[in-house]
Amino acid sequence: MKKQFTGIVLCSTFAVAGWSLQAKAEEPKEYRSNGLVEFIPNVDPTEPVDPENPDPEKPVKPIDPTDPEGPNPGTQGPLSIDYASSFDFGKNRISNKDQVYFARAQQYQENQKETPNFVQISDNRGTNSGWSLTVTQKEQFKATKATLNSQLTGAQISLANPTVNSNAQNVVKPEATNKIALVPGTASLVAAAKQGTGAGTWATYWGKVEVVAERDETNTVHN
């Protein structure tokens, strides 16, 4: 089983054994040998894990509702964004009133249970120098085909009730922003790890999964 080490580049020697040899009626002789170990930053990609029960030994396969060929692979390097959910707000009737729509839960291949939508970060640099994660909505929602009202003016995505989770032991958790209201073109802070914190793999998820009866504009009920 492959083990991944989190640590700064380190070359260290230490005594591992004291060898003794003694003949009858003679003084014992000693010879000391040493051990050598080296740790380097882990640059292997980190697969997504269940945000509610993160275990790197049990990776998951999330589904991207916006891309049948997705999801996109995680970023490269020892400090990486491993995964971020795409949001699916379903089909909704046009209304002239303000409406609130909730994103569907994160789904997975192989019939795994649904989870809240989440983003996953891994810090395998070994420096414990901290990090910050921001999100930017590139532009306002708009139709795939040009129409008179092709842009959803005034719509806003909100992320609330975050939970930061990891299987890392004896490590201080990063801090997540309690509520985020996205503004197109503007970066919003999602989570940050101060100096000396944030090492390992961390999932930040929002809210909890609720089972509801959902009716879209085609009158199809989803449970």
Feature annotation, model-predicted:
Residues Q4-G7, L21-N223:
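Signature of Gram-negative chaperone-usher
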Residues L10-A17:
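Bacterial N-terminal signal peptides
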